[in-house]
A protein has these predicted regions:
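Tandem repeat scaffolds
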Residues: 9-17, 21-354, 358
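Non-Sec secretion/translocation targeting segments of pathogen effectors
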Residues: 1-4, 365-371
């Protein structure tokens, strides 16, 4: 047989796949090291090559790749885009040498990235759209040299930058999840289109005194970020699917005026005032209003109000009412327990005035304490 002949090579692959399958039945932890010899290159067995001499895993071996130790296998020229490496052993990749510098849509669990110094920047110009780094080892990324990180799951990644305030300058962070990453510092004013659409900021830091002016915030998870947000300064007038834990809202009773708010979770936020009459269409379905203050819950012009009660969560909110009759009507309409917090209009106004005065005095008190 001639191992340079494609037909004979395919027969060899079939025999190898069958042998590994049988061995795996005897040893559930099977891990085999394959070696080249003087008449066959192991790369030609494991990989198929295209006309550009780029390579991909042989489909014939797809079910047994998990039994192969890749320690001595080079992935230079490998078409890694879209590949799920989960379950493969000892794969080491240098992103600068893979085909087209493309790791988009790949799942990199277990992959080790070739160790490099900061100056060498092994992810420079590499495509990382929808890339899942969870469970990988050694991924060190300088974001401004990558730009498009949209859709990425960045667990296990360490981020670096020479200028932390502009670490993600020009980068697309939409649909990106920072959970489990290290070192990320985000300035919404310098990212691509100022957009945090469906961005999960868990384990990232936002720059001090973060401004969200003209930013697009929807589907965003803040997860304990210590930041202030005025909804009126956002570019988008529909805010949905956000998790506002840690966010302090600033503004008066009309902070959500002319804004649609749908399916958000306000748990862990501060000072959010929900005036139902000010919201577009008075439509509040799907929101978890824990830790908010709600005005005009009963008086809003809501033709579809009864249909909203099913997915609306009011436990943990402070509901402002004019009198006992209004409180009872709200309890009956929404099926609320007697433990729901209701606040009189007078007490709510007093609390609001106290908070505003505290804010006005804050700078004075701070200066006095530092003298």
């Amino acid at each position: 047989m001639n191992m340079k002949n494609n037909a004979d090579l395919e027969k060899l692959r079939l025999h190898l796949a069958n042998r590994l399958t049988e061995l795996a039945k005897e040893n559930l932890n099977l891990l085999i090291t394959l070696n080249s010899n003087n008449y066959i290159d192991i790369d030609n067995v494991i990989f198929d090559y295209d006309s550009n001499d780029y390579k991909e895993f042989s489909k014939t071996l797809a079910d047994v790749l998990k039994y192969i130790d890749f320690s001595n296998i080079s992935f230079a020229g490998f078409k890694a885009a879209g590949v799920n490496f989960t379950g493969y052993h000892n794969v080491t990749i240098n992103p600068q040498t893979i085909a087209y510098k493309d790791l988009s849509n790949s799942v990199l669990k277990g992959v080790k990235f070739a160790s490099r110094t900061y100056a060498e920047d092994i992810f420079k110009d590499v495509l990382l759209v929808n890339t899942n780094f969870t469970g990988s080892v050694g991924a060190q990324i300088i974001p401004e040299t990558v730009k498009n990180l949209a859709g990425g799951k960045m667990a296990s990644v360490t981020f670096f930058s020479k200028n932390n305030g502009e670490m993600f300058k020009g980068c697309d962070l939409s649909y990106m999840d920072f959970t489990g990453s290290y070192g990320a510092i985000v300035n919404p004013q310098v990212i691509y289109k100022k957009s945090l659409i469906n961005t999960n900021l868990t384990d990232a830091l936002l720059v001090r005194n973060t401004s969200f002016d003209d930013c697009y915030v929807t589907g965003t998870t803040f997860s304990g970020q210590d930041i202030s947000l005025n909804p009126q300064t956002l570019r988008n007038k529909t805010i949905e699917h956000c998790h506002f834990n840690g966010v302090e809202f600033i503004g008066d009773d009309e902070m959500f005026k002319d804004i649609r708010i749908l399916d958000n979770d306000f748990t862990g936020s501060k000072n959010a005032i929900i005036d139902v009459n000010a919201i577009v269409g008075n439509y509040i379905e799907g929101n978890n209003f824990a830790d908010t203050t709600i005005l005009n819950l009963l008086n809003g012009k809501r033709s579809s109000l009864p249909s909203q009660t099913k997915h609306l969560k009011l436990e943990g909110a402070s509901i402002v009412v004019q009198n006992q009759e209004e409180q009872e009507a709200i309890q009956n309409l929404y099926g609320l327990s007697s433990n729901t917090k209701f606040v009189s209009q007078k007490d709510n106004d007093e609390a609001y005035l106290n908070r505003v005065v505290d804010e006005l005095l804050e700078s004075y008190l701070t200066r006095k304490l530092t003298k």
